[in-house]
Amino acid sequence: MSRVYQERLASRSRLSDGCGSVPEPSPKLSIVVAAYCEKDNLQKLYEDLVEALTPLDVTWELILVDDGSTDEDTWNEIAALHCRDARVKGVRFSRNFGHQYGLFAGLSSARGQAVVTMDADLQHPPSAIPLLLREWDNGRKIVHTVRIDNGDTSWLKRTTSLAFYKLFSFLSGVDLSAGMSDFRLLDRRVVNELLQFREMGLFLRGLVHWVGYPSSKIEFQCQSRFAGTSKYNFRRMLRFAWTGITSFSTIPLRAGIIIGLLTSLVAFYQLGEALWLKCFTDRAVPGWASIIGLQSLLFGVLFILLGILGEYMARILEEVRGRPRFIVSETLGFPVDGSQPSPAGLASQYQGLN
């Protein structure tokens, strides 16, 4: 972005909407998209959204959250779209805080009576939004989407995803269907409820189910990524799954009691057998191999349980620290007079600059 363009954009951002127009009334629909190094997808995403929403004759806004992209091009693309269409608004994080926090920042600044969250890679098709709105018009406060695999997903990812959803539902009591994603519609009332949550470990898929309200599901055909590569590697997916489980269930902690009882029974059995052989028979007590093996098993179980306990203690430490969930370094298209919501001034848990 050239210096002249930056100065022109900065001067315009001092006005109400960032590009010189009068602040519009709250739209009926807000679309929230979290993007991390997605510069090649944003233009196509915007065009597809316009194509899908124009026939509906509905007022809308698009909130693009730059989740600390390592390139400048992503934010520059958001700025260009904003100056082309004032309905496009931008939120920029000071660093990468994570996809869930990006979506939450968008929810924090959305003004629509209905809010749709989706990904920037166009695997969530904008053409499905009219179906979401139809369900909302029929009284549904939450409209979930369930992904139909297009065949591009690897066997490993399908299997691990299915295993996670079944495990999560079993441990938490919150029923998540396999294939469920962050592509969903939320009524304003549901959004307001979500914004009251103060926990640091965000797992929106679980939280949306937890708040209740009438809901429905629609299926959509998962598209291939339009450009770029997925930023969600195996390590991130594993961390995401663990956050979801520990955010909604204490069963891993309680499982330690059961495992401890079972291993104690095994230990008592081994001890009783050794005493019986020593006192009532002429057979020699088995050698050190069995004893060391049993001790290794017990210590292994003990350290696993200590690790689980440590994870929960780390979660408690994060909550006690009271740090903001994310820091907003820059915004586009939001008022600076506080007359309407903006990511920079919603609550003390956020820190941002206009």
Q: What kind of feature is each model-predicted range?
A:
Residues 2-154:
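Structured catalytic core of nucleotide-sugar glycosyltransferases
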Residues 37, 72-73, 187, 260, ...:
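Residue-level detector of functionally special positions within alpha-helical transmembrane segments
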Residues 37-40, 123, 127, 195, ...:
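Residues in soluble alpha-helical coiled-coils and helical-bundle/repeat scaffolds
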Residues 49, 106, 121, 143, ...:
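Residue-level signature of catalytic and energy-coupling elements of molecular machines
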Residues 51, 55, 80, 84, ...:
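Conserved amphipathic alpha-helical interaction elements at protein-protein interfaces in regulatory
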Residues 80, 89-95, 99-109, 126-204, ...:
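Acceptor/aglycone-binding surface of glycosyltransferases and processive sugar-polymer synthases
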Residues 95, 120-122, 188, 220, ...:
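Short, conserved catalytic or interaction motifs in soluble domains
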